[in-house]
């Protein structure tokens, strides 16, 4: 039985598949994760793999063996359903639909995608375009018991990004519903670093309560199914998305702990996207999440931890699984 957060909540991390799919599951188990987020294919390319990767059956078996779930698949960074360009829109619909169709093979429950950018067309036009795209995507994917849910992730608010507030997310949900998108097929993800960058004070438990109450009244907290649990290097409201080790950034342990213990979020799956996955900080941040949830004091991080940046988590399955570049 994997280690759980309060009320049996599950904590995962975004881990790379480039070194092998089964090894990624073993790594998740080793670091104490009880859920997993992955890229199912190359996150920076439009071309998708033809057919399942060779390790997929063994990957599923290992997930069952270690009781790691739910699996979230992060869609490619290129996807943008909110922009006015027809070519980009069409490619985005095709790629997101492909990842949704592929998700059951990975035991994927969620396909997480950024809300996107209206690229100057305006918030209203971008919202309508996104809703049209979601309708087209879901029309291409069978609605069966194993189908994954599309999960829209909030934006830090840089440039023309949509989804920077509960109001904008609610408008997206309403626009999608008006086009016949069932609520059971469309969920939402709160990225704590994004919300902080957009100006939401997640360091303050009272402000968190206000935000969640607003989300519940406008959208419904049952549709908030994922939280990307990240601290932030950036100033609140800066629109700068720079993730930090848990409890070492500007959000801090008080706010993150409130999110981890909040009674209205017992159904949510939490996923870390913190720095230094390749340097062993994945295990450290999983442990810190449990300490924060329990209200325990955090150990000091070594000085070099603050210099760590990216990780191989930004890759899909390696060449032995036919990764396409």
Residue map of PLM features:
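N-terminal pre-domain/capping segments
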Residues: 1-75, 79, 83-98, 295-325
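Acidic (Asp/Glu)-rich catalytic clusters
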Residues: 2-5, 26-33, 52-72, 97-107, ...
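Active-site beta-loop-alpha junctions enriched in small/polar residues
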Residues: 14-18, 39-43, 76-78, 116-118, ...
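Conserved, mostly hydrophobic/aromatic
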Residues: 28, 74, 92, 103, ...
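Non-cysteine beta-strand/loop elements that form the S-adenosyl-L-methionine
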Residues: 34-39, 69-73, 186-192, 221-233
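Active-site acidic/histidine proton-transfer and metal-coordination neighborhood
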Residues: 81-187
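Short, electropositive alpha-helical surface patch
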Residues: 87-100, 123-136, 165-175, 206-209, ...
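Gly/Pro-rich active-site loop or hairpin
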Residues: 124, 162-170, 196-267, 275
């Amino acid at each position: 039985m994997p280690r759980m957060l309060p009320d049996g909540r599950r904590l995962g991390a975004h881990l790379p598949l480039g070194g092998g799919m089964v090894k990624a599951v073993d790594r998740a188990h080793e670091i104490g994760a009880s859920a997993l987020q992955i890229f199912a294919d190359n996150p920076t390319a439009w071309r998708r793999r033809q057919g399942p990767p060779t390790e997929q059956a063994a990957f599923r078996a290992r997930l069952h063996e270690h009781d790691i779930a739910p699996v979230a698949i992060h869609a490619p960074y290129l996807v943008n359903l909110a922009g006015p360009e027809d070519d980009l829109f069409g490619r985005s619909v095709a790629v997101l639909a492909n990842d949704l169709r592929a998700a059951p093979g990975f035991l994927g429950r969620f396909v997480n995608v950024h809300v996107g950018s209206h690229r100057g067309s305006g918030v209203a036009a971008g919202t309508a375009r996104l809703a049209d795209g979601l309708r087209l995507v879901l029309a291409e994917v069978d609605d069966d018991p194993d189908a994954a849910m599309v999960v829209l992730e909030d934006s830090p608010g840089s440039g023309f990004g949509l989804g920077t507030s509960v109001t904008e997310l609610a408008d997206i949900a309403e626009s999608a519903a008006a086009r016949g998108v069932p609520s059971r097929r469309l969920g939402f993800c709160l990225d704590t670093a994004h919300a902080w960058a957009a100006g939401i004070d997640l360091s303050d438990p009272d402000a968190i309560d206000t935000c969640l109450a607003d989300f519940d009244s406008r959208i419904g907290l049952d549709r908030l199914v994922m939280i990307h649990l990240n601290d932030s290097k950036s100033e609140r409201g800066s629109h700068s998305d720079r993730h930090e080790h848990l409890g070492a950034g500007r959000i801090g342990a008080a706010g993150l702990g409130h999110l981890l213990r909040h009674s209205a979020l017992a159904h949510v799956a939490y996923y870390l996207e913190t720095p230094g996955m390749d340097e062993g900080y994945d295990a450290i941040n999983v442990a810190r999440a449990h300490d924060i949830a329990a209200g325990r004091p955090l150990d000091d991080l070594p000085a070099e931890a603050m210099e760590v940046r990216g990780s191989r988590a930004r890759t899909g399955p390696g060449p032995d699984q036919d990764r396409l570049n």
